[in-house]
Amino acid sequence: MTESTSRRPAYARLLDRAVRILAVRDHSEQELRRKLAAPIMGKNGPEEIDATAEDYERVIAWCHEHGYLDDSRFVARFIASRSRKGYGPARIRQELNQKGISREATEKAMRECDIDWCALARDQATRKYDEPLPTVFSEKVKIQRFLLYRGYLMEDIQDIWRNFAD
């Protein structure tokens, strides 16, 4: 740690660190708190910031006030990002829960997002197993397991074959 950074107050160092973290991508409040509390890797190994709980609260409040930290924006972007990567609603909900997002906020964002999960599940299945999708039971089970692992709901998976039969 340099001499100039050691003289800076803990609040200023925390705020600088928070802005750097949030400049890369959106984070949930819980993620930011966890990252701010983690020790900083310095030249001589991990270094603690001697900050009080009040300093952490002030930094979080400042980030909220200035629009750097917004859980609803984070949730909407996270859902869009993970759905583009081919993950289903169950997996996305579970990941958001791990990131400290409330169930109510997650459900609200899932209702507001305009994603056709059945079409997305079909797209993932055809990417992995080619078109047309197999109708043999053993092959259908493989596809179902794959889609369940990716986080799709069983009703969306079954709709693939119902719509395919039409």
From Swiss-Prot:
<dbReference type="Pfam" id="PF21981">
    <property type="entry name" value="RecX_HTH3"/>
</dbReference>
<dbReference type="GO" id="GO:0005737">
    <property type="term" value="C:cytoplasm"/>
</dbReference>
<dbReference type="Pfam" id="PF02631">
    <property type="entry name" value="RecX_HTH2"/>
</dbReference>
<dbReference type="InterPro" id="IPR036388">
    <property type="entry name" value="WH-like_DNA-bd_sf"/>
</dbReference>
<comment type="similarity">
    <text>Belongs to the RecX family.</text>
</comment>
<comment type="function">
    <text>Modulates RecA activity.</text>
</comment>
<keyword id="KW-0963">Cytoplasm</keyword>
<dbReference type="InterPro" id="IPR053925">
    <property type="entry name" value="RecX_HTH_3rd"/>
</dbReference>
<dbReference type="InterPro" id="IPR003783">
    <property type="entry name" value="Regulatory_RecX"/>
</dbReference>
<dbReference type="InterPro" id="IPR053926">
    <property type="entry name" value="RecX_HTH_1st"/>
</dbReference>
<dbReference type="Pfam" id="PF21982">
    <property type="entry name" value="RecX_HTH1"/>
</dbReference>
<protein>
    <recommendedName>
        <fullName>Regulatory protein RecX</fullName>
    </recommendedName>
</protein>
<dbReference type="GO" id="GO:0006282">
    <property type="term" value="P:regulation of DNA repair"/>
</dbReference>
<dbReference type="InterPro" id="IPR053924">
    <property type="entry name" value="RecX_HTH_2nd"/>
</dbReference>
